[in-house]
């Protein structure tokens, strides 16, 4: 449930470009965290509404128009906030990419694979378990000891030539053994010539300090699969925790002193095992533990024989 003292912060979700529909569980969790979700068609509206507390862009599968790009950048350059997700696509998205590049980040070509088995799960090197860095948008997730699971992500590249008023912080980072596979029709999952070497950011927070005490804030994650409820359950709610914390960092306005009462989730929590952990427990269950009982059994038998 939730308690409010003022109007709720409004989260406008961009529509009209084949965006993913928000997972119903995460939508419910955002509403429980005291945010009002409205849809936004920039083609008809022309600009981001004045009452927007945050713009939510969920992985457009076709590009935004030149006018929409201008409207989004205008909103952000006036101290706007945005949470942005993208997914790997063979489509060119020059206007969408221009919004990201205006704030110093680019999408790497390909999908990130992890070479370190402590950083991927379920024997799938593209189900990434990145390091969560402590930032204003992620510190509670870190201190709570959560993991996040990030499937099919692209690398995020920080550009060298960005305004000095822009600060980019890494939220999610792969190991330095990660690589980005550009040829997804390849016969191998191993690193090949032409694959970009890591480490890579998979999530960043971006701030830009403006003249009139305003601050632009953006959180960008390079896969919308972060929001899938099945993926979230595998890490006992870690993904949801991070997304909600990122949104709260941006929408924490002084004039909406809201109190959220987290509801207990009845969904199943899975044991989060990286591939390294899984291999260790496999050795224990197949070898060490049965071996221990065998030794004990032999000792008992020897004792009885002597008796």
Q: What are the roles of these predicted feature ranges?
A:
Residues 1-307:
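Short, surface-exposed patches at the edges or C-terminal ends of soluble domains, predominantly
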């Amino acid at each position: 449930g939730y308690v409010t003292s003022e109007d709720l912060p409004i989260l406008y979700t961009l529509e009209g470009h084949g965006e993913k529909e928000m997972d119903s569980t995460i939508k419910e969790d955002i509403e429980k965290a005291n945010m009002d979700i409205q849809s936004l068609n920039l083609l008809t509206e022309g600009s981001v509404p004045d009452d927007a507390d945050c713009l939510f862009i969920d992985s457009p599968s076709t590009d935004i128009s030149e006018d929409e790009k201008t409207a989004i950048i205008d909103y952000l350059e006036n101290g706007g906030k945005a949470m942005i997700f993208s997914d790997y696509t063979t489509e060119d998205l020059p206007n969408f990419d221009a919004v990201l590049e205006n704030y110093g980040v680019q999408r790497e070509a390909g999908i990130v694979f992890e070479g370190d088995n402590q950083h991927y799960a379920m024997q799938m090197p593209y189900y990434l378990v990145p390091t969560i860095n402590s930032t204003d948008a992620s510190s509670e997730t870190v201190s709570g000891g959560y993991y996040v699971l990030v499937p099919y992500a692209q690398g995020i590249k920080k550009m060298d030539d960005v305004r000095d008023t822009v600060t980019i912080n890494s939220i999610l980072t792969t190991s330095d053994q990660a690589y980005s596979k550009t040829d997804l029709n390849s016969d191998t999952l191993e690193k090949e010539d032409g694959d970009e070497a890591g480490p890579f950011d998979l999530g960043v927070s971006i701030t830009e300090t403006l003249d009139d005490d305003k601050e632009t804030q953006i959180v960008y994650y390079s896969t919308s699969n972060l929001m899938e409820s099945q993926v979230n359950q595998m890490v006992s709610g870690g993904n949801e925790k991070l997304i909600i914390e990122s949104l709260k960092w941006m929408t924490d306005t002084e004039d909406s002193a809201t109190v959220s009462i987290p509801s207990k989730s009845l969904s199943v929590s899975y044991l989060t095992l990286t591939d390294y952990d899984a291999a260790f427990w496999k050795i224990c269950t197949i070898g060490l533990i049965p071996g221990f009982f065998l030794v004990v059994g032999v000792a008992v038998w020897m004792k009885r024989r002597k008796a």
